[in-house]
Regions:
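Glycine-anchored, exposed beta-strand/edge motif detector
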Residues: 2-136
Length: 136
């Protein structure tokens, strides 16, 4: 399992057609990290090998300290990742806290796919697709 490399300063939605939500951070969150909602209604860093934290809800679009508001994307294209995987490859929550990977972690949590933008370079981005209703 290989984790995707993220450059926090470059994380941004790659298209206007996206589902974006706001939340309060339960801990320090970095742009590009996968987040989950805690039972207290705040958001922490998701992790595929910790029961409860595998309930990933999206990717942080900006960093936040504990108690600060931040935005995260539930569904849509996200730039800022180095993606060696093939176009349309499935992406999963990693056993590394906050990371996405090319294979399932301890708990299998699909999070999206590799997508090509419509530019001439066919730039690879993460197409975030976090399913809330059907998870665990």
């Amino acid at each position: 399992m290989a984790d995707l490399v993220v450059t926090a300063a470059q994380v941004a939605r790659a298209h206007d057609n996206a589902e974006i939500f706001n939340g309060l951070a339960a801990e320090t969150i970095t742009a590009g990290q996968a987040v989950y909602m805690s039972s207290a209604g705040t958001y922490g860093i998701a992790d595929a090998n910790v029961v409860g934290k595998q309930q990933a809800r999206g990717l942080a679009l900006e960093g936040a300290a504990a108690g600060q508001a931040f935005s995260f994307i539930k569904r849509g294209p996200v730039a800022g990742f180095t993606i060696p995987q093939a176009y349309d490859a499935r992406l999963f929550l990693s056993d590394t806290a906050g990371a996405l990977a090319d294979a399932a972690g301890t708990l299998s949590v699909p999070c999206g796919r590799v997508m090509a933008l419509s530019d001439s370079a066919k730039t690879k981005v993460v197409y975030a697709d976090f399913v809330w209703a059907d998870q665990f």
